[in-house]
Amino acid sequence: MQKEQEAQEIAKKAVKIVFFLGLVVVLLMMINLYMLINQINASAQMSHQIKKIEERLNQEQK
């Protein structure tokens, strides 16, 4: 009977560890997604600014 209780305690600890690690992984994924979205926004802004600069250069050349 005691071995069953020990096994259950170990299983409970293992489940807690897995749950905690799962939360850590989700947190890291959210941080990664946030960084990716920021990079996409920065790239879009740079592209927009480059188009504006090209338009200005084309107007000056005319």
Curated annotation (Swiss-Prot):
InterPro entries: DUF5408. GO terms for cellular component: membrane. It is found in: Membrane. This is Uncharacterized protein HP_0085. The chain crosses the membrane at residues 17-37. It is a single-pass membrane protein. Its main location: membrane. The keyword Membrane applies. Keywords: Membrane, Transmembrane, Transmembrane helix.
